Amino acid sequence: MKKTKKIAISGAAFAGALLSFGVAGAWADDLTQLPAAPPPPAPPPPPAAPTSPLIAPAITGPLTIQLPPPKYTLGPLGDVYVDGIGSGLYQWQTNPVPNVLPGNNRSAGGLNNGQVFVQKTDGLFQFYAQAGAYAITSLGSPFISTPLATWGANSPAGNLWGWFPQGFAKIAPTDNFSVEGGKLPTLIGAEYTFDFENINIERGLLWNQEPSVSKGGQVNYTRGPLAFSLSFTDGFDSGVWNWLTGSATYTLNPANSFEFVAGGNLGSTHINTLRTPILQNNSSIYNLIYTYNADPWIIQPYFQATHVPANFGLYGPSASTFGGALLVNYDVGAGFNLGGRLEYIGTTGNNNLLYGPGSGAFSLTFTPTYQYRYFFTRGEVSFVKANSVADGLAFGSNGTATTQTRLLVETGILF
């Protein structure tokens, strides 16, 4: 049997223990009365990412204007922002069509952007002005150099939109309602007019069927996730006001949006120039556009249909186009992006909207981009394959080639 060890405690020791316990307990009670040490201060919140106060230019990406933009206070006019771009372009292509426009040779290069953007973006009265030089390059179409596009109303390009391609005044009595008028960017399509605004350097086959700049007026209204715009303009910059265009956009969340656009000529227009092609300017056009934009992806598929009604006193039988495109950009990081576009367009009817009645075309474009602050550079390779072409209306010196490959390099500053 295990023995239990007896512990003897004297009265004095027991009293001392009680005294010690009492002192310790009282000391503990005193500690509980002391104020608690204040918690360490919370770290300051990270600075908010700058948001763009700019009206325009609209930029899909991956190129970005550095924020905050330069701002100047001009007395009673208030705060005015000034931005701009300067860039050069070199292009090499197979099967050029040299007899369409001067300089449309196997290779071309030079200044393709030298523009300044000035705008006031708050208050009741606002405005946007874009001025300078630009070139236009789009898939399957002749390259329009800066001198042809910008200078001289008698140039073969018809001067396109001149040295002042876009600019408008805007009245905004509330945050969700505004009216604007002037030389407006079109509501139609998923690609913008100038190359720096888009994922790719060249605009696509579908863009070739769309108006780019129109003179007229536009009303804008937003309510919650819905945004509406309605414009009355001269369509393909014809100088004849007979185009009505509307757009409706639903923003599901910051990453996802859906847009429907419809527009068309309410009458007929007899003008036929490079910037106002007679068939397209007498057409109606429809878009369905979905946009996903959340790092590291931009994904934008869209569908487009156009129709030109018959007018035998003006241009002849009817014709239509139908097509779709997928625009994609992936942000690799450290300033590098990889962009691409896949598209197809087909035509029906007995009039020529592409490379002859009933012709079609497929395209593939790849555009790597690097931007460090204001400096950017990007390259591009594109391929177009046409089908069911009419002799003399496709590629090459005789207009009978059915493919065209292009290599492009662009570099400059965007500030």
Regions found by a protein language model. Name each.
Residues 55-56, 100-103, 147-159, 258-268, ...:
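Outer-membrane beta-barrel pore domains
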Residues 2-98, 415:
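N-terminal periplasmic/intermembrane-space "pro-region" immediately following the signal or transit peptide
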Residues 93-106, 137-166, 171-253, 259-266, ...:
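Surface-exposed coil loops of outer-membrane beta-barrel proteins
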Residues 104-137, 331, 336-337:
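Glycine- and aromatic-enriched membrane insertion/assembly motifs of diderm outer-membrane
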Residues 84, 111-120, 166-171, 181, ...:
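Residues on the lipid-exposed face of transmembrane beta-strands in outer-membrane beta-barrel proteins
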